[in-house]
């Protein structure tokens, strides 16, 4: 496994914002161990009507979208970047411990999230907020909520104020429209990779080997994916989806049909396993027809009924449910 890739998992883009923080405070990507503290901080602000509350399940499933600041093991602030499509992402769940407000923590988190958006290749980032002055200082400009595409309202449907939202909409255009270079080898997925990822996955889905993926699903879950790229083209991909503090699923592992059997899928799975360890997950599982392939990495077959019910959420959309003919395989990390 490329050590540079592992190092990249340990730091949030925009760590130069560290200089904005109080002495001893650390800006970094969230990990599984942060889930309970993130939920508590977000819901403290939600109880005051400042943002939507988050269930622990929602926090764990979106843990890679979060950046946090901590000091001596205490969470000082958090914020998340959620992709909406190839041209738009949202900053959400931005919360700072009241004891640390005004210390530059919120600004450092937002600047890190914007740096992440630039690296992914997202040209615009918006926020729905009551803190318009704060976002204006960071280069955001106000817009009418009606100017935002309808797809961003999915999350808002759960809000008690919907459709009479009283938050202001702010948006910023980012200078780097292309994202980081599409380097050859195994790496985290970028916005520009999604069309080719969809083509590869849906080719195998048409043959009954996995679930199909809509572009909207791939954009919203882009942080789950790794790809193997060659000459700026995706030839393999796969995702690690966090389900809870103790379990993640390897899914959508697919290789371009003309490149199967050359080790590209293995390279992606190795990256997914390494990321699972870096996040702090104790166990991974996969539903698969490829027993031999996953056995190479230490996965073992288990009874499907031994897995918790929460793993079946996505299966409800499968035409084979509940008569699944895939094997359940697990790996203890």
Functional labels for PLM-detected ranges:
Residues 148-183, 307-333:
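C-terminal "cap" of GNAT-fold acetyltransferases
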Residues 123, 129-157, 282, 288-315:
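Conserved active-site alpha-helix within GNAT-family acetyltransferase domains
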Residues 53-65, 71, 77-94, 211-225, ...:
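A conserved beta-strand-loop-helix scaffold within acyl/acetyltransferase catalytic domains
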